């Protein structure tokens, strides 16, 4: 359930267990904790931009998801395998059902990623990691019945709500 808010918020993010202010002008959080919990109940997460490099968020966060029981599908055209799992060139190439698409690519790439999401009939949620936002793409996804989370870390929210 979405809770409408009257004014922009100052959003905070947990980084290494500390709270750091992350003001985002004009951004109003629309994802309630109940909605986030519902999304986090899904099983299969395709990670667009999944990295082979330990120490990078695009590697360590998907690794965390694997370690916490999620079926992670790496999407990276420059890798054959990540975490012992087949890496796919694009969402279009993934033969398995996908519940969540977790994006670790620049905001400018979100519309193209969303096009691939909309070509599938199985994606229930589009999750854009910290500093990744695209209001037009989010609107298109929501109009198609897909939940959207922007500018939030899936790992941080999992830890906070678990």
Regions found by a protein language model. Give the residues of each.
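Extreme N-terminal basic, low-complexity initiation segments
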Residues: 1-11
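Hydrophobic, well-ordered beta-alpha structural blocks that scaffold small-molecule cofactor pockets
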Residues: 15-78, 83
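Glycine-rich, highly charged phosphate/nucleotide-binding loops
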Residues: 27-31, 81-96, 102-112
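Short, acidic/turn-prone active-site loops that include or flank metal/cofactor-
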Residues: 79, 130-133, 152-156
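Structural motif
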Residues: 99-100, 125
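ADP-ribose/adenylate-binding Rossmann-like module
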Residues: 120-141
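Active-site capping/gating segments
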Residues: 147-162
């Amino acid at each position: 359930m979405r809770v409408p808010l009257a004014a922009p918020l100052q959003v905070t993010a947990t980084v290494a267990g500390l709270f750091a202010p992350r003001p985002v002008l004009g951004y109003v959080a629309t994802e309630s904790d109940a909605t986030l919990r519902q999304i986090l109940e899904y099983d299969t997460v395709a990670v667009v931009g999944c990295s082979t490099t330990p120490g990078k968020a695009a590697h360590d966060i998907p690794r965390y998801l694997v370690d916490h029981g999620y079926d992670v599908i790496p999407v990276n055209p420059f890798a054959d395998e990540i975490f012992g799992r087949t890496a796919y060139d694009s969402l279009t190439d993934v033969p398995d059902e996908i519940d969540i698409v977790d994006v670790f690519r620049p905001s400018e790439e979100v519309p193209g990623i969303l096009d691939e999401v909309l070509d599938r009939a199985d994606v229930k949620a589009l999750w854009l990691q910290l500093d990744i936002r695209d209001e037009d793409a989010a609107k298109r996804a929501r109009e198609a019945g897909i939940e959207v989370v922007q500018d939030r870390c899936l790992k941080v929210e999992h830890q906070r709500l678990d």
